[in-house]
């Protein structure tokens, strides 16, 4: 399944935000950590740099984490995810408009003004990217790392939906080494 470039970037950003509070993540404990996260992810626009903004981003992170959790439940997952995405779109008053700028010169959608509060902009963009995923029937691309000691989430954008491990803690390599050692022990 092919998603637009900005949808893929935003899905990865949502994943990184959720993982900031999970195994091997970099917690967003203070404004400096949030600023570093936003710079790494390339978020532009208004930043208030206060405790209210940090709390709003933490609340958004929790809402996104619930969507990943819903996606992994199987039966009823889609309806739960749709309800959560619709609530996020409604709460952010998402209003799509085409734009381009030096950071991303190709035309893409923004769903909030650069002057809107940070959590509102992030929530609107991330909710729309998740809506694209759901509309394409690809909710199962939202996964939790298969490593037994990791609770990080991932977005599987591979062609055949085969990705199993997160990027946060070398989980895939650790699992493959453990399986190899187990096979060697059996022989």
Residue ranges and their predicted role:
Residues 161-172:
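Cysteine-rich micro-motifs
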Residues 1-144, 151-155:
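Short helix-coil boundary/hinge micro-motifs
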Residues 182-187:
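Contiguous alpha-helical segments
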Residues 149-154, 170, 175:
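Cys/His-rich microdomains that often coordinate metals
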């Amino acid at each position: 399944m092919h998603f637009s470039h900005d949808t893929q970037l935003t899905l990865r950003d949502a994943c990184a935000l959720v993982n900031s509070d999970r195994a091997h993540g970099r917690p967003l404990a203070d404004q400096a950590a949030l600023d570093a996260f936003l710079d790494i992810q390339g978020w532009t626009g208004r930043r208030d740099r206060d405790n209210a903004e940090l709390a709003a981003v933490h609340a958004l992170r929790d809402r996104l984490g619930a969507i990943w959790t819903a996606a992994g439940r199987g039966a009823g997952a889609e309806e739960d995810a749709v309800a959560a995405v619709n609530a996020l779109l409604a709460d952010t008053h998402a209003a799509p408009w085409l734009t381009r700028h030096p950071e991303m010169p190709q035309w893409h959608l923004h769903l909030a003004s650069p002057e809107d509060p940070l959590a509102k902009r992030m929530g609107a963009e991330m909710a729309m990217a998740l809506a694209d995923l759901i509309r394409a029937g690809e909710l199962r691309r939202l996964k939790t790392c298969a490593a037994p000691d990791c609770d990080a989430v991932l977005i599987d954008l591979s062609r055949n939906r085969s990705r199993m491990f997160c990027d946060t803690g070398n989980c895939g390599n650790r699992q493959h080494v453990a399986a190899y050692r187990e096979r060697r022990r059996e022989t």
